[in-house]
From Swiss-Prot:
One of its GO terms (molecular function) is aminomethyltransferase activity. This is Aminomethyltransferase. GO terms for cellular component: cytosol; glycine cleavage complex. Gene3D superfamilies: Aminomethyltransferase beta-barrel domains, Aminomethyltransferase fragment, Probable tRNA modification gtpase trme, domain 1. It comes from Thermotoga petrophila (strain ATCC BAA-488 / DSM 13995 / JCM 10881 / RKU-1). Keywords: Aminotransferase, Transferase. GO terms for biological process: glycine decarboxylation via glycine cleavage system. The keyword Transferase applies. Belongs to the GcvT family. Its EC number is 2.1.2.10.
């Protein structure tokens, strides 16, 4: 299994290590519950160095990325980032990603760990007609997420630039704990926070400095378990669970990142799909504390209407919550049932998204 540059730090903190997409990663350090609460009330810190980073350089870098992704990258100012998906020719989602516009001829793409090789090969295969160079810098890049309502105030102690001046989905290159880093106001938790992209060799030093800050405020390191709970509470989608190449962005509530007034791979398929969207992703609150798993059937009046894509117990809400891909006829307020193994049916109410709205900044 692969290890991030912070592996020894996790082991030293007594983390429960697990295999995630071929990476040995911390599931939790003390408990998922405590780590979720730290993110919600103060700060949680995540090692997300398993994510993939691609550097795209050249005079046609912007137009190339604009062709690859469904969102509008061409009009993005320097120093801004954008969330999007990449689709195949059939409109199926290859991956979701964040793209940073560094300059008119340079951009950074951050992709999911399980898709690094697939994405890189797919991106390269579409580059023939563009004057660009594509570098996979994943192995030499570390990524640390510092998330929670006290993130800005706490992190500022170690950052030379003013964090208040970094708007949501903006970034700048700065010095963090004496080390060069790209600091972005982004995250996957539903809280305000920052992600620090830096050279892998510098990661342990920065991690130690951040740990010292956490000890002052009752913050804590957080593992993949807390990350998954936080993202589900905030109703952020997870690739491979809530979406994949068998789903298109219009079905899973991502039509806001699809700009059909520009050209991109999969546009024609999505124009057709827009005429006839048969499924949608909905939020469910289940009765009781049992956790609905991916693939469990969802029923309405005894008839199958879809299936669970993600489920977990929400410590923040004190409820079992889930996302489900269901028939378009299902609406907020509907009473459904989830079929658990053994035939047990558990009641589930369709609720508005998101389940939880935290301190995350809304203005871009």
């Amino acid at each position: 299994m692969k290890r991030t540059p912070l592996f020894e730090k996790h082991v030293g903190l007594g983390a429960k290590m697990v295999d995630f997409a071929g990476w040995e990663m911390p599931l939790y350090y003390t408990s998922i519950f405590e780590e979720v609460m730290a993110v919600r009330k103060s700060v949680g810190m995540f090692d997300v160095s398993h994510m993939g980073e691609f550097l795209v350089k050249g005079p046609e870098a912007v137009s190339f990325i604009d062709f690859l992704i469904t969102n509008d990258f061409s009009s993005l100012p320097d120093g801004k980032a954008i969330y999007s998906v990449m689709c195949n020719e059939n409109g199926g989602i290859i991956d979701d990603l964040v793209v940073y516009k560094v300059s008119p001829d340079e951009a950074l793409m951050v992709v999911n760990a399980a898709n690094i090789e697939k994405d890189f090969n797919w991106i390269k295969s579409h580059s023939k007609n563009f004057d660009v160079e594509i570098l996979n810098i994943s192995d030499t890049t570390a990524l640390i997420a510092f998330q929670g309502p006290e993130a800005q105030e706490t992190l500022q102690e170690l950052v030379e630039d003013s964090l208040e001046e970094i708007a949501y989905y903006s970034f700048r290159k700065s010095i963090v704990a004496g080390v060069e880093a790209l600091v972005s106001r982004t995250g996957y938790t539903g809280e305000d926070g920052f992600e620090l992209m830096l050279e892998a060799k510098d990661a342990p030093k920065v991690w130690d400095a951040l740990m010292n800050l956490l000890r002052k405020i009752d913050g804590r390191p957080a593992g993949l378990g807390a990350r998954d709970v936080c993202r589900l509470e905030a109703t952020y989608l997870l690739y491979g669970q809530d979406m994949d190449e068998s789903t298109n962005p219009l079905e899973v509530g991502l039509s806001w990142v699809v700009k059909l007034d520009k050209d991109f791979v999969g546009k024609e398929a999505l124009l057709k799909a827009k005429e006839k969207v048969e499924r949608k992703l909905v939020a469910l609150e289940l009765s009781g504390k049992r956790i609905a798993r991916k693939g469990y059937e969802v029923l309405k009046n005894g008839e199958r209407v879809g299936e669970i894509t993600s489920g977990n117990f929400s410590p923040t809400l004190g409820k079992s919550i889930a996302l489900a891909l269901v028939s378009k006829s299902v609406k907020v307020g509907d009473q459904l049932e989830v079929a658990f193994p053994g035939g047990k049916l558990v009641e589930a109410l369709v609720v508005k998204k998101p389940f939880y709205r935290g301190s995350v900044r809304r203005e871009v």
